[in-house]
């Protein structure tokens, strides 16, 4: 009887199964989750077999909560695009936003063609410019920077070194945050160089200024301290931001009161294969990292996809010819689906490196000729930004684009002839300069190419930015869809 009594008491003490309501936010943590985790940790901290078994009883409930939240996120991901509404931001006279990333729930950092790095507050619309990091003086001098053990540090204060003249038509093409969101990598004052800032303060950390001979087009973090840059010169540079680099930059700021940064050398520099095509067309245009397999995907403008093993070094694994090889300028990796999405002139191709190239699936963007300018994964939805200022949403699970609403309130949401959902960017700003007056003044309006877009952590806000597709036109667009 005693055993039965104890059993009944234990059973009575077991936490009741949590009830969920569909009206709960998909992204709000259930109230009892923290108490469940606390109880599980308490039981697991007791060093006995009974307590260990008792702690395991909480795991199925946690798995149920996780599965439910994941299902709800997936459900919301397929519904939210149809109800998004646009709010434009004024960026002044900046020219074409090429890159963007969310810093937190209200700030987005952006880079432009005119080599400007700035942060926009999506609540107030305020723009804050970030100083660009310059190369060391006399780059022709022999200097190892922080490339090897025991090599000297080289420091500069922002503005203390005369930077290179801004090269026409280049700018900042990439902005990436490391996995812990403590460092930000982007282009430097010299677009051939890699600049690293500390988050959340955006204090300068270092500049990698001896790797590439041409513009940096793409950046990917392969760990918290190592980043890879892809350049128009056909090379990929591996950079390490070590604890020494971080501590020395912080120490200098504490001593002098002015943020300073060091200059580092690449850890490795690899050229992509050039035996397949014309060597002058082997420009690394986009990178995407698969953390599960420690593999780095790269797309070159000659129409090839390259896969590299990326850990402490870069080693090539394979190269594959893409089915659509014109204007391959964007790349994203879908972790849940183990595929890379590659944008081209009129298609998005889905590539699994472990399958034959004959199994590459491609879908048409319905806007031939304008090009796919940006692509991203969120849950099972692939968001596609086009050169005609459109946002399309492809359901990789159902293998079709999301359907558009039958009625379209507002002027920026419409249903295409095929019945798919398409969001169209606003007017933005266009400079009526001499180029516009000479060649384009008879055209009433220009669509703003979606060069960059990014979701916030909740998946309910989509930041979209870009500018006119024509290279000779000067203008910008930025908006928050929520």
Curated annotation (Swiss-Prot):
Predominant subcellular localization, coarse grouping: cytoplasm
Native organism: Danio rerio
Matches recorded under Pfam families: Beta-prop_DCAF12 (PF23760)
WD repeats: 167-207, 211-249, 279-318, 367-404
Molecular functions (GO terms): ubiquitin-like ligase-substrate adaptor activity
Encoding gene, per UniProt annotation: dcaf12
A GO CC term assigned to this protein in UniProt: nucleus
Summary of the function given for this chain in its UniProt record: Substrate-recognition component of a DCX (DDB1-CUL4-X-box) E3 ubiquitin-protein ligase complex of the DesCEND (destruction via C-end degrons) pathway, which recognizes a C-degron located at the extreme C terminus of target proteins, leading to their ubiquitination and degradation. The C-degron recognized by the DesCEND pathway is usually a motif of less than ten residues and can be present in full-length proteins, truncated proteins or proteolytically cleaved forms.
Membership in a protein family: Belongs to the WD repeat DCAF12 family.
Keywords associated with the record: Cytoplasm, Cytoskeleton, Nucleus, Repeat, Ubl conjugation pathway, WD repeat
InterPro entries: Beta-prop_DCAF12, DCAF12, WD40/YVTN_repeat-like_dom_sf, WD40_repeat_CS, WD40_repeat_dom_sf, WD40_rpt
Upper classification of the organism: Eukaryota, Metazoa, Chordata, Craniata, Vertebrata
Pathway: Protein modification; protein ubiquitination
Record-level GO BP terms: protein ubiquitination; regulation of autophagy; ubiquitin-dependent protein catabolic process via the C-end degron rule pathway
The protein's name: DDB1- and CUL4-associated factor 12
Domain of life: Eukaryota
Assembly description: Component of the DCX(DCAF12) E3 ubiquitin ligase complex, at least composed of cul4 (cul4a or cul4b), ddb1, dcaf12 and rbx1.
Localization: Cytoplasm; Cytoplasm, Cytoskeleton, Microtubule organizing center, Centrosome; Nucleus
